[in-house]
Amino acid sequence: MNKYFENVSKIKYEGPKSNNPYSFKFYNPEEVIDGKTMEEHLRFSIAYWHTFTADGTDQFGKATMQRPWNHYTDPMDIAKRRVEAAFEFFDKINAPFFCFHDRDIAPEGDTLRETNKNLDTIVAMIKDYLKTSKTKVLWGTANLFSNPRFVHGASTSCNADVFAYSAAQVKKALEITKELGRENYVFWGGREGYETLLNTDMELELDNFARFLHMAVDYAKEIGFEGQFLIEPKPKEPTKHQYDFDVANVLAFLRKYDLDKYFKVNIEANHATLAFHDFQHELRYARINGVLGSIDANTGDMLLGWDTDQFPTDIRMTTLAMYEVIKMGGFDKGGLNFDAKVRRASFEPEDLFLGHIAGMDAFAKGFKVAYKLVKDGVFDKFIEERYASYKEGIGADIVSGKADFKSLEKYALEHSQIVNKSGRQELLESILNQYLFAE
């Protein structure tokens, strides 16, 4: 395959001293660490929408992207050419996985029946490519936000007809995701929220959202879909206030509606910062609650208040992210999906490779640093010592449940002189830098 990216050869690992921009400097997919290859540890995935569908249009300007597969008039012809381009790209960058929305891979028709027919045609084409490609599907999902019918939401819409249409669309998306591989299925509620409470029945909307997800669970069981269900938190954009605000919010929702046994979370870095959390905070909260399923790997611009979906190149961020993944024991069905797009001014097809190379190298380097941090127990040792007071005496009584307010008051009256120790944040940040900058 050498039709759409003929100026780019297969991307290979050449090491950090290479001056070849079309090579990996830190990501060697065959390198073995702790019994697994880097490819197995990182499980990189390409986002179909940003990579092959996005055209560079923004609120202030027209499309800028030079995409040779878009030089057709019939939407189905474009969809077929995109599949060809996608698998050429996957092959050249050696991608283990890709992710898609239903409307990324096939255009909508005039009716739902026609739309489903379009999907069947493209899915059959993708299945043919999957027979000979190493690339598999990490997850699929349904686009329940772009079409004007979703102006008031999908499963949380005030219009029951929209709820029904959304259910039909997810039904089909589940079927094709199962047909293409069934690792995971993602729910992202871009329109599931509100602009003002003056016209919103929040209780009904949340109840309906839960009803919708239970229906999805039931149908997945019916068709034998064995993939992991994931919810992707995001606090806002396009909706002012979205119901899947952050990991804590999603977890509370899942537990309230008895859905926590079926769902984990897919955490996106830029969504975390939009919720005013560190990326690591969201990963840590998910990890300690056993719901960290997968990651959308990107970053945002800290000076902008919207989802910029940039390729992640900050080694500190990738290190702390992979620290949480390693502490979790690694990915099961999840992975690192590059929900990232080249900048509007990076419009040449070759830029797609350069962006992904940058992100893959950044996470590979981050993984290696994180692995050493975990192996050396740098932070674990400090944290264990910092909380040592809970290992014996009154602290042990608190943890075991033996203590109560009366016994704690008695202890406090007898030990009125409290001595705290420094948190040593600056030292720990310096140690982190030592690991980051070590050869």
Swiss-Prot record:
InterPro entries: Xyl_isomerase-like_sf (IPR036237), Xyl_isomerase-like_TIM-brl (IPR013022), Xylose_isom_bac (IPR013452), Xylose_isomerase (IPR001998). It is an enzyme of class 5 (isomerase). It comes from Thermoanaerobacterium saccharolyticum. Belongs to the xylose isomerase family. This is Xylose isomerase. SUPFAM superfamilies: Xylose isomerase-like. The keyword Lipid biosynthesis does not apply. Binds 2 magnesium ions per subunit.
